[in-house]
Structure formats: structure tokens, C-alpha cells
Design a protein with these regions (language model features):
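Sec-dependent N-terminal signal peptides
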Residues: 3-16
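Catalytic cysteine-centered active-site loop
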Residues: 33, 52-103, 148
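Aromatic- and glycine-rich peptidoglycan recognition patches
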Residues: 2-4, 23-39, 44, 80, ...
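Hydrophobic h-region of N-terminal signal peptides that target proteins for export
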Residues: 17-21
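Stable alpha-helical elements in mature extracytoplasmic
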Residues: 38-42, 46, 65-66, 70
Length: 155
């Protein structure tokens, strides 16, 4: 009788662990799908602004500065109201390591974590979309004239 109870307990434990492992994998795939659909929504708005002019302190709808642009695209793409400045957006976002960077994450540029002066949105392939002196453009994240301080996830 003791052997039967032991076998039953082992079988039940194995079944339970498989059940939870499957649920965890399912949740992970759902989270990934959600991230992709969120990026698509925000990027759809961002693409419509390509070529719009840069104006310091502007939040849109036809002129932007960098943080005004990210604030605008997240508000109109996802209904998320980001803080106004790049520094405030850095503090607001969940920090992610470069190896975990996903499309839609924010890219923060500055001299240090206490002095962030530019922000853009990662679009994949080592590029971001941002508003800078040439207007709203797609460009490489890494350039000799700036220093990436970190990355942040909004949603």
C-alpha cells in the first residue's frame, strides 16, 4: 500500500510540474505577443511623423522635440501618458539590459544616468526613431557623437 501511495504522489508531482511549466511557457508567449502588438501600435503612429520638424519644447502634432515625440507616440499609440522630459521618462521606465532590448523600448542618451538629454524608440536592427535637429528620423543607436546611457520599457 505504501508503494502505491508513493507512486501516486510521484506521478501527481510530475503531472503538476508539467502543468505549471506549460502555463509558464504559454504566459511567456502571450507576453511576447503583447509586446509585439504594443510596438506595432506605437510604431504605426511614429511612422506617420517621419519628416516632421524639430522644435525644442514641442509635443506635436506636427513639431516635436525628442521627449515630446516619445510622449506623443505612446499616448496616441497605446494611451500611455509618459512624463515630459527625457530624464523623467528614464526614471518612469523599467530598465532593461541591452541583451534584452525589444522593439518599442526607449533608448536614453546622455553623459550619465543623472544627465539624460535625448530619447528615442528602438525599432530593431540597431536603429531607433527619434526627433532631433533634422526632424523625426530613423537612425542608428550607436553614433560617435553620443553615449547611450540605458534602455527602458514602458508597457
Amino acid at each position: 500500500m505504501k508503494k502505491i501511495i508513493t507512486k501516486f504522489a510521484i506521478t501527481a508531482a510530475a503531472f503538476t510540474s508539467l502543468l505549471f511549466a506549460g502555463a509558464a511557457a504559454s504566459n511567456n508567449n502571450t507576453a511576447h505577443a503583447d509586446t509585439n502588438s504594443q510596438f506595432t501600435s506605437v510604431y504605426r503612429v511614429a511612422k506617420t511623423k517621419l519628416g516632421d520638424r524639430y522644435v525644442y519644447g514641442s509635443e506635436g502634432s506636427r513639431t516635436f522635440d525628442c521627449s515630446g515625440f516619445t510622449k506623443y507616440i505612446y499616448r496616441h499609440g497605446l494611451g500611455v501618458n509618459l512624463p515630459r522630459t527625457a530624464q523623467q521618462q528614464y526614471h518612469y521606465s523599467k530598465k532593461v539590459a541591452k541583451k534584452h532590448l525589444k522593439k518599442g523600448d526607449l533608448v536614453f542618451i546622455g553623459s550619465s544616468k543623472r544627465n539624460i538629454y535625448h530619447v528615442g524608440m528602438y525599432i530593431g536592427g540597431g536603429k531607433m526613431i527619434d526627433a532631433q535637429n533634422r526632424g523625426v528620423v530613423r537612425e542608428r543607436i550607436h553614433a560617435p557623437w553620443w553615449h547611450v546611457v540605458g534602455y527602458g520599457r514602458v508597457a
